[in-house]
Amino acid sequence: MKHARFIWILLANSFLTAGSVQAEKNIITTGSTDQTTQQNMLQTAQNQLTNTGRSAGVIHTPTAAGNPVQDAKPGTFYQRARSYSTHPETDPPRYVRNLAKTGIDAFKDLYWLDVGLDHRVRYELRNNDLRRDRITTDHPVLLRTRAYVGIREILDPLRLVVEFEDARRYHGKFPKDNRDWNEFELIQTYGELYFRGALGQDDLGNHRPIRIRGGRMAWEALDRRLLGNNQWRNTTNNFEGFRVTLGQEANDWEIDGWGMQLVIRLIDEFDRRNKSQWFYGAIGHWRKWSEVVTLQPYYMGLMQDDKGGTQAKREIHSPALRAYGVLPGTEIDFDLSTVYQFGRDNGQKKAAWAYFLEFGHTFQQLSWKPRISAFYGFVSGDRDPNYNVNNRFERFFGFARPWSADDYFVPENIKAPKIRLEFQPHTDLRIDGGYNGFWLASKTDRFNNLLNGRGGNRDRTGNSGDFLGHAIDLRAIYKLTSHVNATVGYSRWFNGEFVKNRQLATLGETASGSNFFYVEVSVSAFK
């Protein structure tokens, strides 16, 4: 633990020093009047160009973390966050193409049909996986196939979507679970009423539509921390209910609201919705000032009945605010969120909170466009198991990565500082890596995923400590062809005192840490 703290101090100092050096570089002058005049003229020209671009409806997008540098769509207020791995899946999903735009001459008139087909295979080497209830080495192979068909425009205002998924895990030592296994399942089947110009237009001439959807849906929102379909995981979060959206991503404002019931993934049967639970919410997007900041106030709620005394009765309310953008005149980006939760949870009062802070700097003058960032996340845990107030944060249906590359963590009872570096040495190659530390927010609450999520993952006395461990990770993503992407990754985890103590208490043995290596290949039918 002492070594971990020393490393954190060293990395934090390096990050601040890099920022200071860049700042000094920006303010050093030679004292030459001519050079100062030239700089002022250049800045004036840049400002005029920026204003001209805005009036023409062209907004430049900052470098997307872990993604190629690209301009935003012409005529859009939308700016993509630079923060690491916080970008929701597109709608429709990324592997889907409009047939008329595939370049296949036979399909050039099928503007009304969206289709997609992809397959992913991932080999994993998991040595001493913390999530398991025994210490061993496993070599699972995970397979996932998806197919999508969407009908648009030709039947407007009616639109239709069907998406299929088949997810399986082979060659593993552990029983099937619904994280990895969901055979022959429809993950989306919904109808949509789409009214293109129902709310007029924004200042850039973009139509402000109304969309009303009903049926089974899978989607991601905000930074994916509370609502995501878990692209890394083999199976997909999805829901049944309704969703209403006012506006679109290109507009200066947009409102998205829903009322849903979670779909329970069943291994040997067709999935079905959880009739005893409702998940609802609304998200506002304010993009009028998106060249500096995008604001996303939102609310999420969960209502669950006791199902005849067989489960906890819950009523949880969660107001929140997210703000992301780039500091004017710099390449320093930020992504800030705060969430508060209140209500009733199994007869107890609910009082939980979380906040997420990320600051980064992109070196645009370098050809590889490296970005270095610092992140800190705090998610509350239950402070006192004997008190009638529950402080454990409700994570709703968010993603687990990139809390850790090992997929060990969920947003619950955690303090997590991180330092990351991302760069793109080639058009088709992206690389990122980082150093991460993890502590319990409350040492009397649980580490959710430890030991298969069972009783050994909590010490109500707090005597097992609060340090979970630290990790280093590295990942490379390479576009082999226009249809094939390959990803190789490695993570080394070092056990902290809490993990060692709980493994000893539960298993009678422990290890110094764990290793996780994987190779993933994704194949899409269309470019």
Task: Please report, for each region that a protein language model flagged, where it lies by residue.
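N-terminal periplasmic/intermembrane-space "pro-region" immediately following the signal or transit peptide
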Residues: K2, F6, N13-D138, Y148-G150, ...
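Signature for the C-terminal beta-barrel architecture of outer-membrane proteins
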Residues: T189, Y194-P209, R225-N386, T444, ...
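Outer-membrane beta-barrel and related beta-rich outer-membrane complex signature
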Residues: D129-R131, F174-K176, L226, E269, ...
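Outer-membrane beta-barrel "beta-signal"
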Residues: V58, T76, A511-K527
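Extracytoplasmic loops and strand-loop junctions of Gram-negative outer membrane beta-barrel proteins
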Residues: R97-K101, N128-D133, G172-P175, R224-L227, ...
